[in-house]
Amino acid sequence: MAKGKDIRITVILECTSCDKKSVNKESRGISRYITQKNRHNTPSRLELRKFCPFCCKHTIHAEIKK
């Protein structure tokens, strides 16, 4: 059995293009998704292509700090 830290952790994915637009106040919000990742298989930051309802297109969503 696993000792100490859990192998699967919950991560938050945030739209990278909305993040850039929010500085200019053009966007209505920032799209975020919650998912899980396996620490052993993906030790680096997770990036997935997901649909952003604020951009109305598929964009790259990157893992953010909690």
UniProtKB/Swiss-Prot annotation:
InterPro entries: Ribosomal_bL33, Ribosomal_bL33_CS, Ribosomal_bL33_sf, Ribosomal_zn-bd. PANTHER family: 50S RIBOSOMAL PROTEIN L33, CHLOROPLASTIC, LARGE RIBOSOMAL SUBUNIT PROTEIN BL33C. Keywords: Chloroplast, Plastid, Ribonucleoprotein, Ribosomal protein. Its main location: plastid. This is Large ribosomal subunit protein bL33c. SUPFAM superfamilies: Zn-binding ribosomal proteins (SSF57829). It is found in: Plastid, Chloroplast. Transmembrane segments: none annotated. GO terms for biological process: translation. NCBIfam families: PRK00504.1 (NF001764), PRK00595.1 (NF001860), rpmG_bact (TIGR01023). HAMAP family: Ribosomal_bL33. One of its GO terms (molecular function) is structural constituent of ribosome. It comes from Cicer arietinum. The keyword Plastid applies. The gene is rpl33. GO terms for cellular component: chloroplast; ribonucleoprotein complex; ribosome. Belongs to the bacterial ribosomal protein bL33 family. Gene3D superfamilies: Ribosomal protein L33.
